[in-house]
Amino acid sequence: MAEIVKTMKLHIHPQKNDIAALTELTESYQVACNFVSCYIFDHGFPLNSVELSKLLYQTLRTEYGLKSQLAQSCIKTVIARYKTIKDQLLNHPYSYQEKDEPRQYITRTLDWLQKPALFSRPQADFVRNRDYSFVDGGSVLSLNTLQGRIRVSFDVPECFKDYFDGSWKFGTGKIVSLLGEWYLHIPMTKEYGKEYSSETVKHVVGIDRGLRFLATTYDEQGTTTFFDGKTIMQKRDVFQAVRSEAQSRGTKSAKRVLKRVSGRENRWMTDVNHRITKTLVTKYGQGTLFVLEDLTGVSFNEENISQLTKTGRRQLRSWSFYQLSQMLTYKAHETASEVIKIKPDYTSQRCPKCGRIRKENRHHDIHEYICDCCGYRSNDDRIGAMNIQLLGTFYVSGDTNPKLKHKEN
């Protein structure tokens, strides 16, 4: 059975006294998380929840006032943060290059951290049926606080109603406050009867991600689709200009502006990625294999993107490529389709007609690939999508680790 995971963000409406209780809880939880984080940092990064619970549980109960389940959740929250950091360090090794020597790579571990992980935002993790539960026929939320349980109403927009039909399993939620409003973020899982099978693939779609075109796709029918990124980047430049102006002032009001702009930009970027991925999944439907480049470990340092302008380098580093792949994955799973990631080696350098691989054949200044062997010429992003799609066909044929190999001509 295939499983899909989504996060529902419930807008809750606590009363004035309840807001004080939630504020006290989330602030205490934040301070407690920073205490646990410092302990882990100072003691060689132990990440076993059972052992940490034996050492820190009583302190969290007595000195920070957390209830039993919240104390356990606090430890797990911090462990999860360090495991995420550990994965990030592993996927982005330190690199250096001495004169006339090949570039060297060193795997980074948690020992590379210079200071403990910081929890800067008041929030708390709520376990289903312990810290939060739906009561009164599912119309009211019962929430745990340091002062006892409270009952709050919540909004159920039309797009959320299907999540309450009994087919979704709710997990550990996160209570947060944003601009004076309160939200409970609940991850949900659901099993689907239909599951992707390589034996019933109808479409193989290669997707090249970038900035000039946020996504360029190429399918088994030879159809190419470009998702223009020019207007998107122009709007991001407007956000950046507002941020730069606010940062130059450095006042408290400027910091509030920065916070609002950041939230607005993040929501807008999420919507852009949502619309792109929804378009792709709707267009191709069930039984589609979407193929992406695995950008894990790809370095956006000055050396690798030196051909870009300063603005281009900033845009490349900050665009949410990872979020797009996440959204595409869960949307694909809903339609019994699949997303795979392939090695990006040579995808932008290979001629899809004769197989010639040559870096110089890609001309960034005119955004074209011109093969010096057979003369084939096309948009450089399209070339990338074509090669990515080819690797997808190898995967369908049984090659679980498809990659392009350098072909001498």
Question: Which residues fall in each region the model found?
Answer:
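Nucleic-acid substrate recognition interfaces
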Residues: 1-409
